[in-house]
Amino acid sequence: MMRDMTKGAPLGHLFLYAVPLLLGNWLQLAYNAVDSIIAGRFIGQDALAAEGVAGPVMNLVILAISGLCIGAGVLMSEAFGAKRTARLKETLATTLLFGAGLCCAAAALGCALTPWILRALAVPDSIFGITGIYLRITFLGAPFTFFYNALAAGLKSVGDSKTPLKFLAFSAVLNAVLDLILIGGLGFGIVCSAVTTVVAEAASALLAAVYVARRVPELCPGHGQWCIRRDLLGPILRYGAVTAVQQAVQPICKVLIQGQVNALGVGAIAAFNAVTRVDDFAFTPEQSIATAITTYIAQNRGAGQTARIRRGFAVGLRLELGYWLLMGSLTLLLRRGILSLFVAGEGAADVIALGSTYLGCMAVFYALPALTNGFQGFYRGMGKMTTTLIGTCIQAGLRAAAAAVLAPRMGLPGIAFACAFGWCVMLAFEVPYYFWTCREWKLPKASPSGLRPQARVEAQPPEAALSAETEAGSGPVR
C-alpha cells in the first residue's frame, strides 16, 4: 500500500513505515545465521570456509547494487511527492535498464576473474575449487539481487515498506526450506547452497515485478517509457556512487578495529564476536528509522512542503532516542544473559565478563548512533549524499584511530570509547551543518503548524538542481 507522507501526522508515517524495514533487517540477520548453520552442520568445515571467503567479495557487489538503488529511491521519492508520475516511472525504468546491463556485465567479469580473485585472497588449495564454483554461481545471481532491490526501492519510495518485507520473507523461507531438503535431507553439497540462494533471489525479483506490474500502475513504466534517460541517469549515478562508497567505508573500518581486537587475545576476540551480534540488533532499527526519515523528507521536498520537513525530522529523532532508551535499558539489564547464549564451556566466564563491560559502555553510547543515523537520514532526504559520506568518513577514520590508541591501554572497553569518540565528532560536524542547510533551504522551524497543509510549491527537476550545485542534490527547491 502506497503512503503519501506529504500530509498527515509525521509520527504515524515514520513509525508505520519503519517497522516493516526493521522486521526485514532482522529477518536478514536471522537468515544469514541460519544459512551458515546449515552449511556448517550438514556440509562441513570446508563449506563454511567457502561461504566465508565468498561473503566479503559479494558484499562489494551488494554495496554497489544497494548504492545505486538508494540513489534512485531518493529521486523516486521526490517525484512521488511532487506528483510527477511520469518522472517516477522514467526513473524506475532508467534504473532497471542501466542496472540490468551493469549487473550482467559485472557477473560475466566476476566469473572470468574468479581464479585471480581467489589467488589474491590467498585461498587454501583444499577449498580453492569449491570456493570458485560457489563464487561463480553467486555472481550469476547478482542481476536477480539488483532487480529485487531496485523494485523494492521503487515501492519504498511511494511509501510501501510492507510489500518488500513480504517478498523478502518468502525468499528467506524458500531458501531455508530448499537448503534443509536438498542439503540436510538429500546430502547435496555447497554448490546446491549457492543455487538455492540464486533461486530464492530470482523468486523474490519475479514476485516484485509481477506485483508492480499488476498492483502499482503509478510506478510501472508504460510502453514508451522503457528507455534510459540520460538526464536521469546522471543524478542516479551521482547519488548511487556516493552512497556505495559511504557503505564501503564501514566494513573497512571494522577490519581495522578487528585487528586491534585480535591483539588483545583469544578471549577478547570471542567476546567481541558475541557483542557485535548485540550491536547489530541495536544499530539496525536505528538505520530503519533513518530510512523512514529519508523517504519522508524526500517526498515532502519533492512536494514543496517545506514546513513539514523539520517537524518530521524532529519526530524522527524522538523515535531514534526512544528506541535507544528501550535498547539501552535491555542491554544493561540482560547483557550477561545474552552473552551466555553465545559462549559456553571453559573460559566462558572470562569472555562474558569482557563482553559485559563492553556492553555496559555501549548501552549508554547507543544514543550517539541514534542521533547520527537520524541526521544521515535527513541529509539523504535532502539530496546531500556527499555530506553523508563526509560524516561517515569522519566517524570511521577517528573511530579506527582512537581504537589504535585506546584498545592497548583499556582493552575491549577502549573499543567502545573509540566508537563514542567517532560518533561525537561526527555529530559536531552534522549538527551545525543541519542548521546551515535549514537556512539555505529556508526551512521553517519545527512546530505543530507544520502539520497544516500549505500551498504546494513545484520542485525543481532533480537534474536541474544537480547541475547547479557541486554537491549532488544540494540546491534548494525554489
Where are these regions (language model features)?
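Hydrophobic transmembrane alpha-helices of multi-pass small-molecule transporters
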Residues: 60-63, 107, 175-180, 204-209, ...
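Transmembrane alpha-helix boundary and packing residues in multipass membrane permease domains
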Residues: 21, 25, 37, 74, ...
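Small-residue-rich hydrophobic transmembrane alpha-helices
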Residues: 48-108, 145-164, 271-335, 369-383, ...
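Residue-level signal for short hydrophobic patches within transmembrane helices
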Residues: 11-30, 34, 57-64, 140, ...
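Short runs within selected transmembrane alpha-helices of multi-pass transporters and secretion channels
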Residues: 69, 137-156, 164-172, 193-206, ...
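Short alpha-helical transmembrane segments in multi-pass integral membrane proteins
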Residues: 1-18, 76-141, 185-241, 297-364, ...
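Transmembrane helical elements of multi-pass membrane transporters/channels
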Residues: 16-35, 137, 148, 171, ...
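Helix-terminus/linker motif at the lipid-water interface of multi-pass membrane proteins
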Residues: 30-49, 118-125, 181-188, 248-277, ...
